[in-house]
């Protein structure tokens, strides 16, 4: 995940610079280049195949999935709120900041700053959170979310935007690390199934749904949409799993 973040830093800074030099049509060219590169990457087969003992296939019917959700609903609700609260940021922060007078390149650098903070936390996570449970880390992420989205709704002053972007390491990275720690503590095939649900629901579904709502809210509330995102993150403080086994 760390190296994906490094690539994002380079890509966001480069895109902002190119948009400033040319126009927004360069985004389509970069997207096309990126998709073509991904296709070439998919065509390269790994030279070393994964090895391991075969495992007995466990039931993965609807009953197993429903049981998984019932057992982990607090965790799933918590991460959905925390990740879903990023929807307004992902969808409208660039528009919001440019309307406040920032250039496309400045917006690109701000986005890069957030992911630089993310990379640093990923790299130091073993040392920083060695004694923290997933429950503790989710609390940290929720607090960062309320603070970050509240600041975004209150000001567009550059010093505060720098703080906002540094807090990305708390709102996203710490939440993701907490999720990985929680999932890794499961047993057997539950790890795989819970990872799949987390990726589909928290990292995908919640952001998609919240982006739709954020669009309507941004149209009518403007910067007030970020205050709403702060309220979305707030309940996560109280929905954290009661007991989370340590890794």
Residue ranges and their predicted role:
Residues 153-165:
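Helix-loop junctions at membrane interfaces in 12-TM secondary transporters
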Residues 18-20, 120-134, 218:
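Helix-to-loop junctions at the C-terminal end of transmembrane segments
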Residues 71-112, 176:
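Helix-loop boundary and gating motifs at the non-cytosolic
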Residues 26-44, 224-242:
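Symmetry-related core transmembrane helices of the 12-TM Major Facilitator Superfamily/SLC fold
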Residues 32-33, 136-151:
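Structural signature of the two symmetry-related core transmembrane helices
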Residues 42-83:
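Juxtamembrane intracellular "pre-TM" segments in multi-pass secondary transporters
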Residues 173-187:
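Intracellular juxtamembrane helix-capping segments at the cytosolic ends
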């Amino acid at each position: 995940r760390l190296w994906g973040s490094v690539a994002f830093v380079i890509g966001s800074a480069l895109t902002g610079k190119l948009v400033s030099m040319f126009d927004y049509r360069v985004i389509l060219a970069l997207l096309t280049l990126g998709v073509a590169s991904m296709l070439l990457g998919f065509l390269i087969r790994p030279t070393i195949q994964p090895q391991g003992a075969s495992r007995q296939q466990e039931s993965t019917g609807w009953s197993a999935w429903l049981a998984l959700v019932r057992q982990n609903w607090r965790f799933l609700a918590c991460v959905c709120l925390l990740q879903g609260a990023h929807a307004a940021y992902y969808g409208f922060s660039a528009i919001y900041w440019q309307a406040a007078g920032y250039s496309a390149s400045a917006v690109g650098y701000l986005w890069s700053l957030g992911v630089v903070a993310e990379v640093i936390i990923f790299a130091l996570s073993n040392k920083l959170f060695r004694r923290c449970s997933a429950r503790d880390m989710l609390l940290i992420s929720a607090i960062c979310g309320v603070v970050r989205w509240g600041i975004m709704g209150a000001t567009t002053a550059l010093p505060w935007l720098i703080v906002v972007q540094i807090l990305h390491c708390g709102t996203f990275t710490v939440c993701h690390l907490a999720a990985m720690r929680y999932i890794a503590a499961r047993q057997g095939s539950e790890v795989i199934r819970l990872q799949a649900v987390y990726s589909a629901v928290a990292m995908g579904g919640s952001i998609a749904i919240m982006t739709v709502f954020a669009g309507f809210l941004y149209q009518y509330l403007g910067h007030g949409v970020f205050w709403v995102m702060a309220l979305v993150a707030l309940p996560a403080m109280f929905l954290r799993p009661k007991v989370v086994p340590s890794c």
